[in-house]
Amino acid sequence: MTDVDVYRKRLERIEELLLELSESAERGAVIIVEGKRDILSMKKLGIKGSFELATRYSLFNFSERVASLGCEVIILTDWDRRGDLLAAKLSEYFENFGVKPDLQIRNKLKLISQKEIKDIESLYTYVSKLRVKTGSSLNSEYETNLEFER
């Protein structure tokens, strides 16, 4: 398998996860990130929806407020030490409030990126680089989403 094939497979897997994330967001899921740059990266990737910054309030109060919304919760914190701790703590709080948060997308992105990136804000740049390396362009789903964002 050539490097291009490896990059192509990685790009396909990331785009599948982004599509899954986009569909969840359209159904009303709340996406929890750490910072404003994370939101910007997600929007550049065509993800529209409700984003919440986990770092603006106490985690207990934040989790209680988001849990009271009664919607699906997707935790998309960075995969550095701080992000791992934050994801674990948020998950614990949400479960105490009766909400089972989705950590699968975060965990799969962490695995796929193979330590080439460690945060959500770098995801757009990483995907762009993979597209250049593989000769791919934005797929029509993301082009459509980006057109609405402009």
Curated annotation (Swiss-Prot):
Its cofactor is Mg(2+). Binds two Mg(2+) per subunit. PANTHER family: UPF0292 PROTEIN MJ1624 (PTHR39964:SF2), UPF0292 PROTEIN TK1411 (PTHR39964). HAMAP family: UPF0292. It comes from Methanosarcina mazei (strain ATCC BAA-159 / DSM 3647 / Goe1 / Go1 / JCM 11833 / OCM 88). Mg(2+) 2 binds at residues 78, 80. It holds the Pfam family Toprim. Residues 28-109 form the Toprim domain. Keywords: Magnesium, Metal-binding. One of its GO terms (molecular function) is metal ion binding. This is UPF0292 protein MM_0821. PROSITE patterns: TOPRIM. Belongs to the UPF0292 family. Mg(2+) 1 binds at residues 34, 78. InterPro entries: TOPRIM_dom, TOPRIM_RNase_M5-like, UPF0292.
